[in-house]
Amino acid sequence: MRKKKKKIVLSSTSEAEKVSIPYLPDDLLLNCLARISRLYYPTLSLVSKRFRSLLASTELYETRRLLGTSESCLYFFMTERRNDHEVYGKVEWCHVVHTLPLFNLSRALSCYHCLSHCFLMIIYIILFSI
């Protein structure tokens, strides 16, 4: 007597498809988010209030530190003397040649006058991994 072969039919909504990423537990979702570059965090924060909250949490940055996925960046601030314009930003995609040891914040503040004296640049340099 021949044995009938069992046919496996996959439904269009299998059990694996029913679990959606936004409904994962927080600790698992934090682990996933910690592996993604910070470059994508502004876009991911638009997914939901929960994502925005997790992306702003200290737990995410602690998870990134533990996983070794933290990224170095440089924050800066400049003002123009004549028009009181302010420029600030963040440099991320650079190779860190040398990191500075932690130091007193008052020493991090420095003033520089360019040769034409039209800019007063106050530069706050904060190097850290986030």
UniProtKB/Swiss-Prot annotation:
Pfam family, one: F-box
Cited SMART domains: FBOX (SM00256)
InterPro entries attached to this UniProt entry: F-box-like_dom_sf, F-box/kelch-repeat_ARATH, F-box_dom
Protein name stated in the entry: Putative F-box protein At1g77880
CDD domains, alphabetized: F-box_AtAFR-like
All residue ranges annotated as the F-box domain in the record: 18-64
Signal peptide: none
Organism: Arabidopsis thaliana (Mouse-ear cress)
Superkingdom of origin: Eukaryota
